[in-house]
Amino acid sequence: MLPLFLVLSYLGQVIAAGKDVETPLLQITVPEKIDTNIQDAKEAETQVTYVVRIEGKAYTLQLEKQSFLHPLFGTYLRDKLGTLQPYFSLVKTHCFYQGHAAEIPVSTVTLSTCSGLRGLLQLENITYGIEPLESSATFEHILYEIKNNKIDYSPLKENFANSEQESQSYRILVKPEKGSNSTLTKRILRIKIIMDKAMFDHMGSEVGVATQKVVHIFGLINTMFSQLKMTVMLNSLEIWSEQDKIETNGDADEVLQRFLLWKSKEISQKAQDITYLLLYKDHPDYVGATYHGMACNPNFTAGIALHPKTLAVEGFAIVLSQLLGINLGLAYDDVYNCFCPGSTCIMNPSAIRSQGIKVFSSCSVDEFKQLASQPELDCLRNTSETEFVVQPQGGSYCGNHLLEVPEQCDCGPPETCTHKKCCNPKDCTLIDAAQCGTGPCCDKRTCTIAERGRLCRKSKDQCDFPEFCNGETEGCAPDTKAADLEPCNNETAYCFGGVCRDPDRQCTDLFGKYAKGPNYVCAQEVNLQNDKFGNCHGRCNYSAIFCGKAVCYWNFAEVIQTEKYDVQYTYLGGQVCVSAHLRSQTGTRDDTYVHDGTVCGSGQVCFRGDCLRVHVLRGTRECEADDKCQGHGICNNLNNCQCESGFAPPECDMTPSSPGGSMDDGFWLPFDKSTPLIFKRHGLKYKKVLLISFYILLPFLVVLAFMAVKRMIGKRLAKQNISKALEHKEEAFNRGSMNPGVVSGGNTDQNLMTVPGSFNSYAYHGNTDQNFMTVPGSFNSYSYHGNTDQNFMTVPGSFNSYSYQDVPYYRSIPEDGNDSQQ
């Protein structure tokens, strides 16, 4: 069973706190904006400073702009029929800031500056909320203290297959020498939020207000995750404004399973997007549930978070932050072994009921550095295609490679425009008669959308599939790869993260062509040492010997030349084993450890330093290859079949003409199974088409003219020679000479002619209305099965052999993406 975390709140022990825990001690303050000396208007917009007086003391708030909303962020309403309707929200995406009070270095400020200041000021051990006084003409704001200390509950329940081992692993991870020298790099966690009807009603039943509150919560979350250089990007908000789509009552794990099942079946939910359902309950028994370390596993990218009646906005932001931390693989803090700069750190179970600054502890930071170097969090590195660009107020952003309303195209900034003949990079408009100006499926020379079937993204691995243009849009089809733990390499290995995890291949990539995977004795000797050259992210169990450091055979007399790793050589049983240690912990993936998904036993693979059963990690899937793909394909990461050559999607039906593929690769379009497959050639240039057509048509016209002349001559010759042929028939048989043989079965209306001097053999089976002619000097053999209305002619001196048996059309795709016909 995968590790499932339930964040429980035993609110039966809660001291009654009334309707709201925000006990306001109201103050009136007038924030003063300080002009900066920055001349650049754009740069000045990204940094602002305000002075706010709290209890008579002035605090200087130094703020920088936050960018955590997707450029195409939107709010959607789902009605009773399940239809998703866009709501055109007036939420402004350019006025969210975070920073600190200059007078208190250990402080955090998260504000929206549109129409006044709204947000939180977390000053050491006290938190203030600030909002504009709507009726004030002098920019007055109300300031109030926020308290959560009325809440008293134990927030954590764990469901691990081996809780003792997990605890031990955590203690090892928080040792200061582990990852202390590594540097974090920018990462993005993309998330979609769904709000149930009770939560919507609690927030006022007004879409604009609910949207603003959710955005405000994610402003707080991003302030906390900025310490890890992590942006939690809010992609969209969906509101169940009329009726819930699942039953939200019951135990935490039951609700989570129902939500995960609904998400997997809902076409609008992308499998790779992590999605959270926000629920409201007056007195729940828990405040959240999610899967541990599954942020990049599309089968488990879901969670639920409950907003109790007595929890403030700040506390709910901490609940979500803890759940997201669990998604990333973090554990709750051991307060006796972790250093916390403030009074309470984010992954401390008691953080939900405390006020003031919230940061990640030394344990969480070191643990995240370790996790970030592992392949299970590779999806967080994808920051290029949808990297957030702050949009100017009132419009889209021209030059960010994103096609937004009202842009006609977007080829990037002028100096690096990718489609200079098609798109004007200054105003993002199409040039002249251009049909497109953005994306890999827009031809840069003709400015037209490429035809269906053109290769636009090559395969990188046998577990990564090629994508093609679909002939309708200028963008390439979404990147598809094999679902995790699908078989590869002739079923000797498994796919994981779009790569076939073969131990021999990892050894070759790590040490060179003379390295290969180890046996048990070699791996045991090295990995049980529990040093920097041999460990399993901690001490190895005997069952996980193959899941620690990559220990390889070295079959070469020279030492390994590398500047990236320290290499250890172990002589054992007449053979040399090598393992490595990454010298510089830079936040990149540490490939000296065995990759997740690598085989470690029969039906077992490595996962986070342990050897687990494949069926346990796979769980229940929407796509099972043996059933859905009929044994002639594997499942991709979108739960569709990737079919073998000779079998056609979506269900891998036998189709000899099919090159294989899936319904997601861009080439295949939805079709009726009764409709024959017709493929078109792509990629031929206009001049080449004319030239090829000329060379094809010219011989055809010559042959056609020659046929007409020869047919006339043939008829005359036939009349002259037919009587002679009959006269000599008996004489020829008596001489034992070779004669034309005609075998015909069930044929009607046949016109056959042979000419003296030729050797002809014909076989017709069920053919009707046939017309054949041979001319002198030719050796001809024809065989037709089930064909009707055929007309053939051979020319003198030719050797001809035809056989037609309803052979299907065949299509192949070369590397350059152009089709070839055979």
From Swiss-Prot:
Residues 1-16 form the signal peptide. Disruption phenotype: Binding of spermatozoa to the zona pellucida is significantly reduced in vitro, however oocyte fertilization was still able to occur. The keyword Transmembrane applies. Pfam families: ADAM_CR (PF08516), Disintegrin (PF00200), EGF_2 (PF07974), Pep_M12B_propep (PF01562), Reprolysin (PF01421). It comes from the Eukaryota. Residues 187-384 form the Peptidase M12B domain. This is A disintegrin and metallopeptidase domain 3. One of its GO terms (biological process) is proteolysis. Residues 395-484 form the Disintegrin domain. One of its GO terms (cellular component) is protein-containing complex.
